Protein backbone atom coordinates (compact mmCIF):
# COMPACT_ATOMS: atom_id res chain seq x y z
CA UNK A 1 0.00 0.00 0.00
CA UNK A 2 0.99 3.66 -0.26
CA UNK A 3 1.44 6.35 2.34
CA UNK A 4 3.39 9.51 3.14
CA UNK A 5 4.07 12.10 5.80
CA UNK A 6 4.63 15.85 5.89
CA UNK A 7 7.95 16.16 3.97
CA UNK A 8 7.67 12.99 1.84
CA UNK A 9 5.43 12.81 -1.21
CA UNK A 10 5.08 9.06 -1.41
CA UNK A 11 6.08 5.83 0.28
CA UNK A 12 5.44 2.30 -0.91
CA UNK A 13 5.03 -0.33 1.81
CA UNK A 14 6.24 -3.40 -0.05
CA UNK A 15 6.03 -5.88 2.86
CA UNK A 16 2.62 -6.05 4.58
CA UNK A 17 3.08 -6.02 8.35
CA UNK A 18 0.67 -8.94 8.78
CA UNK A 19 3.34 -11.23 7.31
CA UNK A 20 6.07 -9.96 9.62
CA UNK A 21 3.79 -10.34 12.64
CA UNK A 22 3.90 -14.11 12.19
CA UNK A 23 7.48 -14.14 13.45
CA UNK A 24 8.08 -11.51 16.15
CA UNK A 25 11.71 -12.70 16.52
CA UNK A 26 12.57 -11.81 12.93
CA UNK A 27 14.81 -8.77 12.52
CA UNK A 28 13.59 -6.89 9.47
CA UNK A 29 15.07 -3.90 7.72
CA UNK A 30 13.03 -1.31 5.87
CA UNK A 31 9.52 -2.32 4.89
CA UNK A 32 8.89 0.80 2.86
CA UNK A 33 10.73 2.96 0.38
CA UNK A 34 10.58 6.52 -0.83
CA UNK A 35 9.46 6.36 -4.44
CA UNK A 36 9.87 10.03 -5.36
CA UNK A 37 13.03 11.83 -6.46
CA UNK A 38 12.34 15.45 -5.46
CA UNK A 39 10.44 17.22 -2.69
CA UNK A 40 9.92 20.37 -4.76
CA UNK A 41 6.45 21.80 -5.28
CA UNK A 42 5.21 24.72 -7.33
CA UNK A 43 2.53 26.76 -5.55
CA UNK A 44 0.82 29.69 -7.26
CA UNK A 45 -0.75 31.20 -4.13
CA UNK A 46 0.70 34.25 -2.42
CA UNK A 47 3.38 33.49 0.14
CA UNK A 48 1.85 34.15 3.55
CA UNK A 49 3.71 35.70 6.48
CA UNK A 50 5.17 32.98 8.66
CA UNK A 51 8.12 33.19 11.08
CA UNK A 52 9.18 29.54 10.99
CA UNK A 53 11.25 27.94 8.23
CA UNK A 54 10.74 30.46 5.39
CA UNK A 55 13.11 28.31 3.32
CA UNK A 56 10.44 25.60 3.24
CA UNK A 57 8.38 27.55 0.70
CA UNK A 58 8.38 25.53 -2.52
CA UNK A 59 9.14 22.29 -0.64
CA UNK A 60 6.54 19.78 0.39
CA UNK A 61 5.68 20.22 4.08
CA UNK A 62 2.20 18.72 4.49
CA UNK A 63 1.83 15.75 2.13
CA UNK A 64 -1.15 13.55 2.92
CA UNK A 65 -3.87 11.37 1.40
CA UNK A 66 -1.74 9.44 -1.11
CA UNK A 67 -4.45 8.16 -3.48
CA UNK A 68 -3.78 5.84 -6.43
CA UNK A 69 -6.17 6.83 -9.21
CA UNK A 70 -8.43 3.91 -10.14
CA UNK A 71 -11.25 5.71 -11.93
CA UNK A 72 -10.49 5.35 -15.64
CA UNK A 73 -12.20 8.64 -16.51
CA UNK A 74 -8.94 10.55 -17.01
CA UNK A 75 -7.59 8.16 -19.63
CA UNK A 76 -4.69 5.74 -19.96
CA UNK A 77 -2.01 8.34 -19.16
CA UNK A 78 -3.37 8.50 -15.59
CA UNK A 79 -3.43 4.72 -15.08
CA UNK A 80 -0.41 4.72 -12.72
CA UNK A 81 -0.96 8.11 -11.13
CA UNK A 82 -1.02 8.75 -7.40
CA UNK A 83 -2.57 12.02 -6.22
CA UNK A 84 -1.30 13.70 -3.06
CA UNK A 85 -2.81 16.68 -1.30
CA UNK A 86 -0.58 19.46 0.06
CA UNK A 87 -2.74 21.90 2.06
CA UNK A 88 0.03 24.27 3.21
CA UNK A 89 0.89 25.15 -0.40
CA UNK A 90 -2.72 25.01 -1.64
CA UNK A 91 -2.19 22.30 -4.23
CA UNK A 92 -2.65 18.70 -5.34
CA UNK A 93 0.48 16.93 -6.58
CA UNK A 94 0.70 13.94 -8.91
CA UNK A 95 3.33 11.20 -9.02
CA UNK A 96 3.47 8.57 -11.79
CA UNK A 97 4.53 5.08 -10.74
CA UNK A 98 7.08 2.95 -12.55
CA UNK A 99 7.50 -0.69 -11.41
CA UNK A 100 10.95 -1.52 -10.05
CA UNK A 101 11.40 -5.03 -8.70
CA UNK A 102 8.84 -5.68 -5.97
CA UNK A 103 8.28 -1.95 -5.50
CA UNK A 104 8.05 1.26 -7.50
CA UNK A 105 9.83 4.46 -8.34
CA UNK A 106 7.81 7.55 -9.15
CA UNK A 107 8.27 10.81 -10.99
CA UNK A 108 6.39 13.91 -12.02
CA UNK A 109 4.00 13.52 -14.93
CA UNK A 110 5.02 14.75 -18.35
CA UNK A 111 3.96 18.38 -18.65
CA UNK A 112 4.00 18.83 -14.86
CA UNK A 113 7.76 19.12 -14.40
CA UNK A 114 7.47 22.67 -13.04
CA UNK A 115 3.81 22.95 -12.19
CA UNK A 116 1.22 20.93 -10.28
CA UNK A 117 -1.77 18.86 -11.34
CA UNK A 118 -3.94 21.32 -9.42
CA UNK A 119 -2.88 24.53 -7.72
CA UNK A 120 -4.93 27.44 -6.43
CA UNK A 121 -4.26 31.12 -5.86
CA UNK A 122 -6.70 30.92 -2.94
CA UNK A 123 -4.77 30.69 0.35
CA UNK A 124 -7.89 29.20 1.96
CA UNK A 125 -7.78 26.18 -0.37
CA UNK A 126 -6.64 23.37 1.94
CA UNK A 127 -7.00 19.95 0.28
CA UNK A 128 -6.76 17.30 2.98
CA UNK A 129 -8.24 14.16 1.42
CA UNK A 130 -8.66 12.76 -2.08
CA UNK A 131 -10.88 9.92 -3.25
CA UNK A 132 -11.87 8.36 -6.57
CA UNK A 133 -15.63 8.48 -6.97
CA UNK A 134 -17.96 5.89 -8.51
CA UNK A 135 -18.32 8.18 -11.54
CA UNK A 136 -14.53 8.16 -12.12
CA UNK A 137 -14.05 11.74 -10.94
CA UNK A 138 -11.62 12.86 -8.25
CA UNK A 139 -13.24 14.18 -5.10
CA UNK A 140 -11.22 16.54 -2.91
CA UNK A 141 -12.11 17.45 0.66
CA UNK A 142 -11.08 21.07 1.21
CA UNK A 143 -10.66 22.04 4.88
CA UNK A 144 -11.03 25.73 3.87
CA UNK A 145 -9.06 27.40 6.64
CA UNK A 146 -6.89 30.50 6.74
CA UNK A 147 -4.50 29.00 9.30
CA UNK A 148 -3.45 25.40 8.70
CA UNK A 149 -0.49 25.19 11.10
CA UNK A 150 -0.70 24.08 14.70
CA UNK A 151 -0.86 27.25 16.85
CA UNK A 152 2.22 26.14 18.81
CA UNK A 153 4.30 27.01 15.75
CA UNK A 154 2.95 30.58 15.59
CA UNK A 155 4.40 33.15 18.03
CA UNK A 156 1.93 34.73 20.45
CA UNK A 157 2.46 38.18 18.93
CA UNK A 158 1.34 36.93 15.54
CA UNK A 159 -1.55 34.92 17.00
CA UNK A 160 -3.02 38.13 18.35
CA UNK A 161 -3.23 39.52 14.80
CA UNK A 162 -5.09 36.62 13.18
CA UNK A 163 -8.15 34.53 13.87
CA UNK A 164 -6.73 31.04 14.36
CA UNK A 165 -10.20 29.53 14.02
CA UNK A 166 -11.21 31.38 10.85
CA UNK A 167 -13.16 28.94 8.69
CA UNK A 168 -13.73 26.34 11.43
CA UNK A 169 -17.42 26.15 10.47
CA UNK A 170 -16.77 25.84 6.74
CA UNK A 171 -15.48 23.35 4.19
CA UNK A 172 -15.76 22.45 0.53
CA UNK A 173 -15.84 19.33 -1.62
CA UNK A 174 -14.52 19.62 -5.16
CA UNK A 175 -15.24 17.25 -8.02
CA UNK A 176 -12.43 17.19 -10.59
CA UNK A 177 -13.12 15.86 -14.09
CA UNK A 178 -11.31 16.16 -17.44
CA UNK A 179 -12.60 18.94 -19.68
CA UNK A 180 -15.46 17.66 -21.82
CA UNK A 181 -15.62 14.33 -19.99
CA UNK A 182 -18.89 12.44 -19.81
CA UNK A 183 -19.45 11.10 -16.32
CA UNK A 184 -20.47 7.49 -15.95
CA UNK A 185 -23.83 6.56 -14.57
CA UNK A 186 -23.51 5.09 -11.11
CA UNK A 187 -25.03 1.60 -11.04
CA UNK A 188 -27.15 0.34 -8.19
CA UNK A 189 -24.89 -2.50 -7.10
CA UNK A 190 -27.41 -3.62 -4.51
CA UNK A 191 -29.82 -4.41 -7.35
CA UNK A 192 -27.41 -6.54 -9.41
CA UNK A 193 -27.35 -10.35 -9.34
CA UNK A 194 -24.22 -12.08 -8.07
CA UNK A 195 -22.92 -12.89 -11.56
CA UNK A 196 -22.94 -9.23 -12.61
CA UNK A 197 -21.28 -8.22 -9.36
CA UNK A 198 -18.44 -10.63 -10.16
CA UNK A 199 -18.13 -9.14 -13.66
CA UNK A 200 -17.96 -5.67 -12.08
CA UNK A 201 -14.64 -6.62 -10.45
CA UNK A 202 -13.07 -6.23 -13.90
CA UNK A 203 -14.39 -2.69 -14.31
CA UNK A 204 -11.74 0.04 -14.90
CA UNK A 205 -13.18 1.97 -11.97
CA UNK A 206 -11.88 0.29 -8.82
CA UNK A 207 -14.52 1.99 -6.70
Language model segments and positions:
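Beta-propeller domains with acidic blade repeats across secreted/periplasmic ectodomains
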Residues: 1-198, 202, 207
